Amino acid sequence: MKRLLLVSFLAFSVHSLADDTTFDWSGLERSKISLEAPLLIVKGSLGFLGCGYINTDSCIDEACAIVSGVNTHDDMLKASVKAVSKDATKLGIKVGMTGVEAMELLR
């Protein structure tokens, strides 16, 4: 049983590391403002993915998707989208999709 748990943990760890190192950040601008919890944004040509500091109601004529509980840009990729602006909805971004899925539509 212990061996099975160890193998499962190692497989998950390797898979997680692979996800972080394989994302193509080209064409995207990453910004971070260091606060008690960081303010994070990843900007693509069609809009941006932001952390919980951003309110979609203030994203007038902007396609933005919001993820929360993140501390790094890599965390943003794995997190679930919690809110979307009207313009982001027009691009096909939906609450519940991953940050990676949203970024590919905002790229």
Predicted segments with their positions:
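N-terminal signal peptide c-region/cleavage motif recognized by signal peptidases
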Residues: 13-15
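Residues that scaffold, gate, or flank divalent-cation-dependent active/transport sites
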Residues: 19-107
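Positively charged n-region of N-terminal signal peptides that target proteins for export
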Residues: 1-4
